[in-house]
Each structure stands twice: as C-alpha cells, then as structure tokens.
Regions:
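Alpha-helical transmembrane segments of bacterial inner-membrane membrane proteins
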Residues: 1-872
C-alpha cells in the first residue's frame, strides 16, 4: 500500500512539473473564478452584517420599537406606550443624517443620534468622555454641543472643545465637541463613527420640537412580548408601526435580496468558465499521456486508479486555486464593500460607509474554506469527464501506432438533440412564475441556453472540416494553405476545441447579454427622464444629493419658500414636490405629493393607458392616486380599484386613476395631489421645488436670484442646491451608471478567464503537434509560417466563439430583460440592440484569441527541428 501511494505521488509530481505553464494557467483561471465569487459573497454579507450590527447596538436593551415612517412619531405617544402592561422603560430616539460643511471632509454624511443622555448613558454600549472646565449637566444638555465617536473625531481632525460646521435641515449650524464616545468593545462599532446629542437638543437642532424618529421600548422578561405588542397596537394610532428591532434588518434583506442574488449569480460565471478551463487542462493531460495510460493499464492499474490519478491532479489544482482565490477574494471584497454599500444606499436604504469596513482577519478563514470548497468542486466537475475517459482507455489501442484521439468519434447527432432539448427547456422555464419573488426559473433558463450553445460548439468546429472546396481553394484567400491546415487541425479535435470555444462563448455571451440589457435599460431611463423631467431647474436642500444617507430633516425645505420663489423675476411657476414613505396595505411605499394641476399643465407622467394631463387632473379632482407599474404589480391592483393607505387619521381607501412607468425605485411609488396630502398628514414641508421659467428667462440670473432671496430672508440658512434641468438629468444617469460598475468588473473577470482557456488550448496544442510542426519546418516551412499557422487556429477558435457568443448574448439579453429583470424588479424595459457593442465584442474576441495565441505561436516557431523529429 505504501509503495502504491509513493508511486501515485511520484506520478503526480512528475505530471505537474513536466508542464508548469499549463498548470499555472489553470491555477490562475480557478483562482480568478473563486476570487470573484468569494469577493461578492463576502462583501454582500459584510454590508448586511454592518447594518444589522448598527441596528442591534443602537437598540441596546430595547425589545420593541414604535415607528411612524418618514414623518416620525409625536412625543405625546410616550405616555400611552409607558402605560402599556409589561413596559418597563420608554426610550425616545432621533436618528438623522447631517453633512460636514468644512475642511477636507466637506460633504461627508454622518449619523447623529438624539438620546436621553441622563437616563441612557451606559445602557447602549458606550460611555462619554466629557470636556473639563464646564458644568457637566449644562454641557450634557446644551443645544450647540455634540459627542463624537473616536474614529469620527480622528477622521475629521477634531478634539474635545473643537468647533465645526455642519448642514442640518438646509441650515448651516456651528457645533462644538463636548466629548468623545468610548465603546465598550474592541470590535468596530456604530458609535465609533456616529455623533450624539441629548434628545431635547437634537429636537431643537432639527427643528422638530415634539417629534421623534422612533420610540424604543424595554419590556419585562416575564411578560409575553406578543401580548405587549397587541396592547400597544390597540392603544396607538394605526399609522404607527410596532415591531422588533431585528425586523428592520429582515426588511432590508428582503429589499436587497434580488440585487444581491443577481450580482452573486454573475460572480459565478467566472467559476463556470473556470470549469471549462479545468476540463480542457485535464483533457489535454489525458490526450498527451494516452500512451502512458495504456502502459499503466497494461501493467495492471485499475480503471478506478487511473481516474483517481487525474481527479487528484484536478483536486490539487482546485485546492491551491481555492486558497489563492480565497485570500485575493477577501482583499478584493475590501474594495467592493464600499461599492456595494453605495449601490444599496442609492437604491434601497442608507448603509453607513463607516460601518461597512471589512476586517481581513475576521473573514480570512471563512473565505479560505469557501475558496477551497468552490475550487475543489469546480475542478472535480471539470475533470470528471476527462478522468472517466482516461479510465476507459483501451491499452491495445493506446499502445498501437497512430493517433488514439483521431480514432475517437464524437456522437454529433447526440449533441444536436441535446442542444435542441435544452433550447426547448429554456423556453419553457422562461414562461414560469418566480419563486418567492425571485427569478429562479429565469436563471435556470440562462443556464440551459449556455449549455445548449456549448453543445453546438463541437458541431460547428467539425463542420469547418466538411466545408466543400476545390483543391485550388487551398491557395486562395487570406492565409492560403496555412489557413486550410489550421482549419483542418481544429476540425480533427472538435471535443476539446469545443470546450475552448464554449468557455469563450460563455464569457462573451454573459458580457453581451448584460451590456445589451444595461444599454436597453439606460436608453429606457433616458427616454423616461426626457419625457418626465421637464422643470427648468430644481431647488433642493444642500444635502439632497446624499439621498437617504441623510434624514428627513436634511432632505426637506419649508413650504413657505414656494411663494418666495414664485416672486422671483423670470419664474413662471413653482411646484411643491414631497417624497415620503407611508404604509400601504402593510408595505412601505414611496408617496409623492405635488400640485397635480400644475404638473398637468407643465409636465407629464408616462401613463400606460390614457393621456397624462387628463389622468393628473382626474386624480386632483377625485382625490385619487396614480401608481407606478412596479407598485401595481407588487400589490396586484389596477386602474379603477382602490388602495388602502394608512394615515394619522386611520386607513383611507383611495381610488387608482392610472398606472405609469417609473424607474426611480424598484419598490414602486404612488402620486397624489399636495392638497390631499396636507389634509391627511398635516405636513407642510417640501422635498424639492421644481421651477418652471418664463420663455427667454436667463437661467443663470434666476439661479443667482434664488440664492440671494433665500439667504436674505432666512437667517442661518445654508445656500440651497439650484440644479438645472441638464444637471439633474446627468445626476440621475450618473446614479444609474454607478449601479452597474460592479457588473462590469465581474464581466471582465469572466472574459479574462476565457482568454486563459484559449491560451491553455493553444499551448497544449503546440506541445501535442511538435512533430507535425517540426516536419513542416523540415520540408521548408519558415518560422513565420509556423507562427501564422498557430495564429490562424487561434483566430478560428476566436471567431467561432465570437459568433456563438453574439447569438448567446442576444438570447441571454432577452431572458434578462423579459424574465429576470421583470421578475426581480418589475420594470418594463424596451430592448434595443447596440450594433456597435456587438462589433466591439467580436473584435474583442478575435483580439483576445490572437493575443492568447501569440506566445504559443512564437514558442512553436522557435523550437529546434531536431528535437521535434527525435521520435521519428
């Protein structure tokens, strides 16, 4: 047994050291595929974990919380909450975002918490280090002081006693550092990068006297939590939500799961392409050592041992590649965390950039385990077919003169029938409904499409050799006889060359499919922006571009500004646009209120049926709403039906007058008239003021007048953002483009792995054909002609991969747009085929193939003829 194991190890070492280039190419391919998958998984987990950690730390000992959505909670509710049975403590909380207005960190958003500092110090995982020389109680409660987390103070270069300026609710406010927050744990904490004030001081700062963001409730351990929840629901207004703090994390996970699943699936493409690379590597090993395998079989090595030999080699490649990919994946995840958190913040919910900071050591071991597992699985799957083929080698045929591989014929009709069956299955899967809101069958349909095209690859390669031609055709056309020899050689090995073409095809198809989807989506969004963003300019809070990273107080302006803005010369009309989230049939939905009659005159919504102006006036006259396509599908409603909206006065049933296309959020939105909104919610604030100018008005002059008017009439107000129509459109499209940066990174990795596959194929093909190439040189072929021969073969493989990649990419784009995107987010996208992108993809494939073939071609041309003919 020991001798057998030693012999086995010797054979493995010999095989690995004989062809180091091929081994390194395979290792690199596996490592890159594992790296992409580990990086995305780690970044996704870390971002959600940071949000969960923030919720848990801030909640402290609270077991329930009372929320009022974007409009907050009236502090008089505290008395009713405190009176509920089983409640032992009631903790008011204000949580808002503010923006730094000075220094190198100008424009950076940070979370500010307003808490009852007298009653809560030491209960939430932090302690205060106050400044000296000032009355402790006065310092604790002053409205112009704040406590900073240690990391935040370090980043902003502030010390105890320092003064700094921030933007709060459209006002410039000067605060001074009363002290630092010290956490009671060594790990990263939300308090390290947060700001803290007393609850009363925070209410003054945010001009929200009597309002809270939420009320946290501490309950008795011996009292059933469900009974306390029921008592609170009975005692409080129906527009208030009572939930456990952990539910916020679950809600965020529910919102982002489609986004994270789509990104994760895309990261697995590298693994899929890596599987083909391993298949090729092991298949070439088997082909090159076929005679050696025949000797092993003749000497008594069992089929199982032969298969185990090659599977072990693949397993070693997978383990080593998995280790390297796991380590580099964690390093890459450190850069992707900020990208993922920014995308989630843009589209869903604010994720503090300070919290989403990865610890390399924390993730290393789990990443290594994941990497080794993925690498081993990918390698074993890729090596399974070639290993079985090796184990079934017939010793007599392998030891006989001639090419064993040429005598093996592929069952092409079987490949054709399989491809047809997979295409049919893909079509059926595309028609099925999503599972739990996720396009599972859509992903399976894409897998079937790629598998079907992979089955066509060997058929297409062998078809090259059956093209009818006359003898003189060998001398005609580009490349002449060299081109025909290259085609003939490629056609002699449809199996393993088909694997190479499939790898390139998959990488290219994914790239084309995603690019066509993104371009179609962008063009649809551009059309939507051009049709709906009509206002000449928008007046917004200075922190508005930070989106939901800042709170409602920093994203709202006084409604009284409308009259002041309307009085400015050159201004024809001013709309009042308010954006809040409210409860609709148990779900959080974006509610837009504005002057619908003015909007009907000046702008439009892309209504699915009917005329925009008519529908807007009808909504204003009847007290109805317009709902977005996404929301209508999500709630299962349509025009003519009613929708239940929870308001401070109770649940209101509102008629739906129209559906419209909207691409601002994947959660959907509804639009109502501002007068109706104010009557129901008693909220006079405005998110932005869309401004319509007189014909011929000077945009620059009006912009200056707006800033002067606001600064002159409002004390301490920060200059608002005045954004022109062109700037607003550009900002919308910039946000769109940011969301797909991660997609492009993953595509590039998949295509690069496919290029490694071409290089691996050509390197091994050159090694296998040393005698053939040496014979050509011996009868007069020049080194240049040998190089051209290899490059022609590379070009044919690249061209075939490009053709199949374009076909697969277009089919994939249809599934992405019509099935996966529709089921994931609900948007209707008008598909457009960018011909320029397809041409670029073909050029990329050919260029990549030629680049990959250059080194093998050069190496083949420089090999000594004598060594190549030695066995002859």
């Amino acid at each position: 047994m020991i001798r057998s194991t030693s012999l086995f190890s010797l054979l493995l070492r010999t095989h690995v050291t004989q062809q180091p280039v091929r081994v390194w190419l395979s290792l690199l391919g596996v490592s890159l595929g594992v790296m992409a998958s580990v990086a995305i998984t780690t970044a996704n987990v870390d971002v959600l974990r940071s949000f969960e950690q923030a919720v848990t730390e801030v909640a402290g000992s609270a077991t329930l919380e009372v929320l009022g959505g974007d409009l907050g909670v009236d502090e008089t509710v505290i008395m009713a909450v405190r009176a509920a049975p089983g409640v032992t403590a009631v903790l008011p909380v204000i949580e808002e975002g503010i923006v730094m207005a000075q220094g190198g960190r100008h424009g950076e958003a940070v979370q500010l918490f307003g808490l009852d500092l007298i009653g809560e110090v030491g209960t939430r995982g932090f302690r205060l280090q106050p400044a000296s020389g000032r009355d402790a109680l006065e310092q604790l409660l002053a409205s112009d002081t704040a406590y900073l987390g240690e990391k935040l103070a370090e980043d902003w270069h502030l010390n105890v006693g320092s003064q700094f300026e921030v933007i709060v609710g459209g006002r410039a406010v000067r605060l001074h550092v009363a002290g630092l927050l010290h956490t009671e744990t060594a790990r990263s904490s939300v308090w390290n990068r947060a700001m803290l004030m007393d609850i009363a001081a925070a209410q003054v700062l945010f001009e929200s006297i009597g309002r809270l963001d939420r009320i946290e409730v501490v309950t008795a351990q011996d009292y059933p939590l469900e009974d306390i929840e029921a008592a609170l629901r009975a005692a409080l207004s129906p527009n208030l939500t009572i939930q456990r703090p952990a539910q916020r994390t679950k809600q965020v996970e529910q919102m982002v799961r489609a986004f994270q699943l789509n990104v994760s699936v895309l990261s697995w493409v590298g693994l899929l392409v890596g599987t083909f690379l391993i298949y090729n590597t092991i298949a070439f090993m088997v082909a090159q050592r076929r005679r050696e395998i025949g000797i092993y079989r003749a000497l008594g090595m069992t089929e199982r041992r032969v298969a185990a030999l090659f599977l072990t080699e693949a397993g070693i490649l997978g383990i080593v590649g998995g280790i390297v990919g796991g380590i580099t994946g964690v390093l890459l995840a450190g850069n992707l965390v900020s990208l993922v958190s920014q995308t989630i913040s843009d589209l869903y919910v604010p994720i503090s950039p300070g919290l989403a900071v990865m610890s390399f050591n924390h993730h290393l071991w789990s990443a290594l385990l994941q990497g080794v597992s993925l690498g081993t699985i990918v390698s074993m799957i890729g090596a399974w077919g070639p290993s079985l083929d090796a184990s079934r080698t017939i010793a007599v045929r392998a030891l006989a003169p001639g090419d064993y591989e040429v005598t093996q014929q592929l069952r092409l009709p079987g490949f054709a029938w399989t491809a047809g069956g997979l295409f049919s299955l893909a079509a059926i899967l595309s028609l099925l409904n999503p599972l739990a809101g996720l396009p599972v069958f859509g992903y399976l349909a894409t897998l079937c499409l790629l598998a079907a095209l992979s089955c066509l690859a060997p058929i297409c390669i062998q078809a090259l050799g059956f093209r009818p031609r006359r003898a003189q055709d060998f001398l005609l056309g580009p490349g002449g006889s060299l081109r025909q020899i290259a085609v003939s050689h490629a056609a002699r090995h449809p199996g393993r060359n088909g694997v190479t073409v499939s790898a390139l095809m998959i990488g290219l198809a994914i790239m084309i499919g995603v690019v066509v989807m993104v371009r179609s989506f962008r063009q649809t969004v551009e059309l939507w922006v051009n049709e709906t963003v009509i206002a000449d300019m928008v007046v917004a809070p200075s922190a508005w571009l930070h989106g939901r990273n800042v709170g409602q107080a920093s994203r709202a302006l006084p409604g009284t500004w409308a009259a002041k803005l309307a009085s400015i010369d050159g201004v024809a009309a001013v709309d009042t646009y308010r954006d809040v989230h409210v409860d609709v049939q148990g779900q959080s939905v974006a509610l837009i209120s504005r002057n619908l009659r003015l909007h009907a005159q000046r702008s439009r919504y892309l209504v699915i049926e009917g005329d925009s102006a008519t529908m807007l006036r009808r909504a204003a006259d009847t007290g109805g709403v317009l709902v977005s396509e996404v929301l209508a599908n999500r709630l299962g409603v349509r025009e003519g039906m009613s929708i239940a909206i929870t308001t401070p006065a109770g649940v209101q049933s509102v008629p739906i007058v129209a559906k419209f296309y909207d691409y601002a959020t994947d959660g959907g939105k509804m639009v109502m008239d501002r007068a109706q909104y104010q009557a129901l919610w008693h909220d006079d604030r405005v998110t932005v003021f869309p401004i319509y100018l007189d014909v011929g008005a000077d945009v620059a002059a009006v912009r200056r007048s707006i800033a002067q008017q606001v600064m002159m009439n409002e004390q301490g107000v920060a200059s608002p953002l005045v954004i022109s129509n062109a700037e607003l459109r550009r900002e919308i499209l910039d946000i769109f483009d940011r969301t797909f940066v991660l997609t492009y990174v993953l595509e590039a990795i998949a295509v690069f792995i496919a290029v490694l596959g071409i290089m691996n194929t050509l390197v091994t093909a050159v090694l296998e054909r040393r005698r053939e190439l040496a014979t050509l040189q011996a009868i007069g072929a020049s080194p240049t002609q040998v190089r051209q021969l290899v490059l022609w073969e590379a070009a044919y493989l690249g061209a075939l991969g490009a053709v199949l990649g374009v076909i697969g990419g277009l089919l994939l784009a249809v599934v992405l747009i019509k099935v996966i995107n529709k089921q994931s987010f609900g948007w209707t996208i008008q598909m457009t085929v960018p011909i320029g992108v397809l041409l670029q993809a073909v050029i990329l494939a050919l260029g990549a193939a030629l680049v990959a073939g250059y080194w093998p071609a050069r190496w083949a041309a420089n090999q000594p003829v004598v060594e190549g003919l030695r066995e002859e």
